[in-house]
Amino acid sequence: MAKKISALQLMAGIAALSFGFVSCSTEEPSPEPEPEPEGPSPYVAKVFDYRPAAGQYVNVIPEYEEGDTQEDMNRKALEAICGDADGMISLGGFGGYVVVGFDHTVENKAGLCDFRVLGNAFYATGQSEYGNSEPGVIQVSCDANRNGQPDDAWYEIAGSSHNGTESWIQKAADAGNDTQTVRDYEITYYRPASTPTKPTKEYIRWEDNQGNSGYRAKNDTHKQPYYPQWIDEEKLTFKGTRLPQNAIDLSGQGNNFGLFRFAYGYADNVQSTLDPSAIDIDWAVDADGNPANLKGIDFIRIYTGINQENGWLGECSTEIAGIVDLHMCNIVIESAGIKK
């Protein structure tokens, strides 16, 4: 704030200039104080790659504008999920992902959860088993070569369906869902020739490496293209661990879908304020399922873990609203209480 100058001071200054007064003081002007350096942030500091699969919220959160490049969309994704921005990004259908980094190493503290991925999952009224769970698989990496880039080995957070099962699996199987966890799953989406003006169940074609094929449906609510418009490729291929299909039509009429929560270890799976949304770095495993034994992490990659259409709700698509270093926020959550 500028210092207020009195009329008397102003007049004295004018007089000094008029009569050529020269100060006899030998004192140097006081230097401006250096700004205090900002400390590390508990939130995401950079988005390295935002690459969603086809989905009803793609090109909307964040918004694609004509001419946007990959760099533009990375920037928009960061603006949506950094700090307390209160925004959100959609990863689209299975495989769509975002790669983020911190301005510090997130420490792995023994027996404690280390970070939390924020999403928009919630429970249905009066429920603690299902609601709007759209789980994303989480991978972590440390900057082993110290070049500031996410180009070192990735390790998967072994959530509850990695080697185990969920309490609702039989119910999902009875409903006709594919309840297998598939490692090395691969899916390819094909750019549609045009965007239909009316709802259709056959909008964006996909094929996977399990011999299955189908379409991403187009609904009446979201009228924009569902294929990411800044990507030039005519097809998009994603790989990863595919989780069991968790959406069940509870009504039998196609108008009341319950998306059942997984026990632990995934993004956008339970409400972000609840302990099971927290992640312990000790859950990270290598490609052979062996503990990664990481002292800390610098990068996180999250991708949508389910390939499923849920009637009028649309596809299962992981949404991300941010990531928080729990230790920097003095939030203590014991991982043993979650993984049980």
Predicted regions and their residues:
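A generic structural signal for short, non-catalytic loop/turn and secondary-structure boundary residues
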Residues: L10-I14, P150
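Short loop/turn segments immediately following beta-strands, especially the blade-tip
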Residues: S141-N147
